[in-house]
Structures are given as C-alpha cells and as structure tokens.
Swiss-Prot record:
ATP binds at G10, P11, A12, S13, S14, G15, K16, S17, T18. GO terms for biological process: nucleobase-containing small molecule interconversion; pyrimidine nucleotide metabolic process. Keywords: ATP-binding, Cytoplasm, Kinase, Nucleotide-binding, Transferase. It is found in: Cytoplasm. Belongs to the cytidylate kinase family. Type 1 subfamily. GO terms for molecular function: ATP binding; CMP kinase activity; dCMP kinase activity. It catalyses: CMP + ATP = CDP + ADP; dCMP + ATP = dCDP + ADP. PANTHER family: CYTIDYLATE KINASE, CYTIDYLATE KINASE/PANTOATE-BETA-ALANINE LIGASE. Gene3D superfamilies: P-loop containing nucleotide triphosphate hydrolases. Its EC number is 2.7.4.25. This is Cytidylate kinase.
Length: 227
C-alpha cells in the first residue's frame, strides 16, 4: 500500500499535536513531533544559560546529545535528549516562553529540519509544526493549516497544564499565546503561514473527533488515488 506524508501546521495550541497523534495511530503512520525537537533545543539552552549569541554551543549540545523519540507502556510518545527523558520537562512554562527565539535561529532550524527530512524520506509520516508544509516537507501530499481563536487555544492549554500538574493562569496564557502568534508570524526565518496548497480549517468549537475525521478522510482519499 502506497503511503503519503502529511503536514499539519498552525499556531500554538491549535490542536495540531493531539490530532496528528490520533491520525498517526489510525493510519499506522509515524508521528514526528517537530515542536518537541525545538523545545529540546530550548531546554538545553536554558539548562546551560545560553542565549541567542551562543548558537555554536547549542548546536554542539544537539550533536552530543541527539534527540530521539520512544513509546511509553501506554503507547504515548516519550522524548529523549541523549539518554535523559524530557517528555514533561520540555512542556514547562519557561521552555514554552523561550522556544520562539531558539527556533528563530537559522542554524538550529537548519540542523533540526535536516533531521526531520531524513526521517520523512520513506513516507508514512505525520508532522506538525509551524513550517512543515512550507519549508520542511514542501512536497507533502496533504497539507493542513489549523487555526482557532486565542480564547479557545488558551482554554486548551490551561486544561492541558492542569492535567499535567503545571500551574498556570488563564489570562496570562491568553497574552502569552497572542504574543507567541505575533513572534511566530513576524520572524525572519520561516514565519508562520499556510502553504499555498494547504487546506485551512478553523477548529474553534469543533471537537477533536471532528477535526480528525476531516483530515483523515482527505488523507484516505489521496492514499486510495495512489493505489
């Protein structure tokens, strides 16, 4: 059976990761969490007190301690930097609030994009991020761009944090998400934008199941056409 690559892009907390993981499981595809890779680079930078001018040092750490993915007993994805599991550590607020400047560094993006492309070359990959359809996998057979209101996205992040035992304030999350949107869409390197051939879908008020069904039907149609 012929497989395809699926690119899902969109702003922070638009539901990309949740949806991508479910579709990957349903189609028996590999889910590649690109956002987690940038969070790993950010986590390393913060751990060592590195700033934007310390690019070569951050790249050195990424080379010494490569990022990899595993599976927990319940089937959920785990993230490692070298041998250290960082699945929860990279979701802390300090990492979230610093990931934009790290991911805007051209050399770091280039290194991680090369890793992502190598993984995707055999197909059957679902990737989500902010520039998958435009930069990482411009030849992906299916490109989706998810959007949702700031209020809805803040609510999702708030619930997510509660479930993980991370303390957060709803109004603070709203302003952080709005600021993140601005930074992501105005950065010089790979700004957040939909690919010209992407299908845009507003998930405000739409259930996760509804979004999954919408994307999976599109994917299955393309897969059928290839067979």
């Amino acid at each position: 059976m012929n497989s395809i690559n699926i690119a899902i892009d969109g702003p922070a907390s638009s539901g990309k990761s949740t949806v991508a993981k479910i579709i990957a499981k349903n189609l028996n595809y590999t889910y590649l969490d690109t956002g987690a890779m940038y969070r790993c680079a950010t986590y390393l930078a913060l751990q060592h007190g590195y700033e934007a001018q310390d690019v070569s040092k951050i790249l050195g750490l990424l080379a010494e301690r490569p990022i990899s993915f595993g599976k927990a007993e319940d089937g959920s994805q785990t993230v490692f930097i070298g041998t250290e599991e960082v699945t929860l550590a990279i979701r802390q607020n300090d990492v979230t609030n610093n990931v934009s400047w790290v991911s805007a560094i051209p050399e770091i993006r280039e290194e991680l994009v090369n890793q992502q492309r190598r993984i995707a070359k055999d197909g059957a990959i679902i990737m989500d991020g902010r520039d998958i359809g435009t930069v990482v996998l411009p030849d992906a057979e299916l490109k989706i761009f998810l959007v949702a209101s700031v209020d809805e996205r803040a609510e999702r992040r708030f619930k997510e944090n509660q479930e993980k035992g991370i303390e957060s304030d709803f109004e603070t999350l709203k302003s952080e998400i709005a600021a993140r949107d601005y930074k992501d869409s105005h950065r010089e390197v790979s700004p957040l934008k939909a690919a010209e051939d992407a299908i845009e879908f507003d998930t405000t008020g739409v259930s996760i199941e509804g979004v999954v069904t919408f994307i999976q039907e599109k994917a299955e149609k393309i897969i059928d056409m290839k067979n």
